[in-house]
Design a protein with these regions (language model features):
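Beta-edge loop/turn motif
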Residues: 1, 162-166, 170-198, 220, ...
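Conserved ATPase-coupling elements of RecA-like P-loop NTPase cores
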Residues: 9-22, 45-46, 161, 187-190
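Catalytic acidic motif of RecA-like/P-loop NTPases
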Residues: 9-13, 151, 184, 200, ...
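Conserved interdomain linker/interface between the two RecA-like ATPase lobes of SF2 helicase motors
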Residues: 9, 23-34, 39-115, 142-155
Length: 351
């Protein structure tokens, strides 16, 4: 192998999947790499490390120009009304971003009444589906959704269902797609508009605001090169804020002397966002990409499944391959030592 092109390289910093992007850099020092991402941020770490380990000069090529410009808007209307406006103004397909699979699936039901397909499009959907087997509980729901022009897309669906949604979307037969923030690598779903339902996400321990990188990656799905001249990214205000604004407007126009309506509180697992937060995410630079110590189990499991590992061009077997790879790991010295020191324990725990 002389040349390796690595797309979506920002996943190098993913706590679970990052090793899939890290290992080639460590195991193939004599190979030329092209590392690509729209949201890399500061790449000084990689430039210095690659130059040190490979002895080659490293060029950084940057461009902030999008072939399809995006228009951003912060919304204080209800989510349903925002979807209606996008449909009425011809800005479909719309990808509605949820942050759990259940929320995405549950939301799809509510958009059936919008009836976004023409009669001709409904016929085309039925023809495209043909004798496709929706042979599971979620499959029966999905059939109702897609025949109405509404799709669901997330990792919890069977692959055949995800592929069907992608095909119908590519044919222009889905006007609304409810999905999660994970839509990305290897997925080709044409999107005209992206609609964020929120700007915070539970990460397993807490509920932080999205990073600049995550926001940019999701927003970047809007606008289809070759199909659209522009794309739209809308962000909903928190649901309780929208409801409270509506209650205040209703109270202001009412002649009733009833007691003031109590304001609705935010839902659980919530971090506050507003227009200022939205603008910071819209205008912010992506954070730098860093490796993670706690993803070592993934690479160790991968390496020990091989009878022989290749490190620095040499055949290295067993635990030695794991240790040598971890010692070459890009990162601070203390982090590198922590990774290497944990390898023996993880290796031995597999039985």
């Amino acid at each position: 192998v002389d040349l390796v092109v690595v797309d979506e390289f920002h996943y190098y910093g993913d706590p679970q999947r990052g090793w899939a992007w890290q290992v080639p850099l460590l195991e193939l020092p004599d190979v030329q790499f092209v590392l690509m991402s729209a949201t890399l941020g500061d790449v000084g770490l990689f430039r210095r490390d690659l130059e040190t380990r490979t002895g080659r000069s490293v060029s950084v090529v940057r461009s902030a120009q999008r072939p399809v410009p995006l228009h951003f808007e912060y919304r204080t209307s209800t989510l349903h009304h925002s979807v209606e406006q996008l449909l009425e103004s011809g800005r479909a397909p719309i990808y509605i971003v949820h942050f759990t699979q259940k929320d995405a699936t549950d939301a799809a039901q509510g958009y059936l009444a919008l009836d976004p397909l023409t009669k001709d499009e409904k016929v085309r959907v039925r023809e495209a589906i043909g004798d496709f087997r929706f042979d599971s509980p979620i499959g029966k729901d999905l059939k109702r959704f897609v025949t109405a022009g509404v799709g669901v897309h997330h990792a919890g669906l069977l692959p055949k269902y995800r592929l069907l949604v992608e095909k119908l979307a590519q044919d222009g037969l889905l006007k609304i797609i409810c999905g999660t923030d994970t839509l990305g690598v290897g997925v080709n779903v044409p999107i005209r508009s992206v609609l964020f339902t929120q700007l915070c996400k539970y990460d397993g321990t807490s509920v932080p605001i999205l990073s600049n990188r995550d926001f940019a990656q999701i927003a970047g799905r809007a606008g289809r090169k070759g199909f659209d001249t522009e794309g739209d990214v809308w962000v909903q205000a928190p649901e309780h804020v929208v409801e409270n604004l509506r209650a205040e407007e209703k109270e202001a126009t009412s002649n009733s002397r009833k007691k003031r309506v109590k304001k609705k509180a935010p839902e659980r697992n919530y971090a506050h966002w507003d227009q200022n937060v939205f603008e910071k995410l819209r205008d912010g630079e992506p954070e730098g990409v860093h490796s993670h110590q706690h993803d070592k189990n993934h690479v160790i499991d991968c390496l020990r499944s091989r009878e022989v590992g290749i490190v620095d061009g040499e055949r290295v077997e067993g635990c030695a391959a794991v240790r040598r790879l971890l010692e070459a790991h890009v990162g601070a010295g203390a982090r590198r030592r922590g990774l290497s020191g944990g390898a023996g324990g993880v290796w031995g725990s597999g039985g």
